[in-house]
Swiss-Prot record:
SUPFAM superfamilies: Peptide deformylase (SSF56420)
Active site per database record: 155
Protein name: Peptide deformylase
Gene responsible for this protein: def
Biological process annotations from GO: co-translational protein modification; translation
Amino acid sequence: MILMKDIVRDGDPVLRQVAQKLTFPLSDHYRKLADDMMEYLVNSQDPKIAAKHQLRAGVGLAAPQVGEGVSMAALLVPDDKGEIIFKEVYVNPEIISESVRKTCLSEGEGCLSVDKVIDGYVPRPNKVTVHYWTVDGEEKAIRLKGYPAIVSGHEIDHLNGHLFYDRINKENPFALDEDTIVIY
């Protein structure tokens, strides 16, 4: 079971490296890693389990965040009522198309690997198409909009050595294009 002590923190070099692509079939080690990352997200969104194990809630977790420099990320995205609207483990994902129009979260973004609050909007494409493989080696492409697109972008950024605050406007952290969609 992944706990907060297992989450790599900002400053660790693995978070700034481009993750290595995985080959199929996945080894038992990487299949277990996928299961463990999803288990963390499920547990972190359950108030009783999260309190018992002192887990910070998460909607996505990339392999580099647990010290594994490979291209894999788990996503468990709820809507504003807490219902799960997207659940997947991406292997070797890439965003192959994105909208010009941006979106962002009204509260900004956070990250399990970043312990401090960093104020500012994190503009991301409102719509993305993600090409990836499942843990079982099935090739997929999915079009996402809004919050699932934001979470996908955040996790894929991890796999490319970027953190959310890299996208915040340094001169004016709350500046947005006038057609940016602000959600939640």
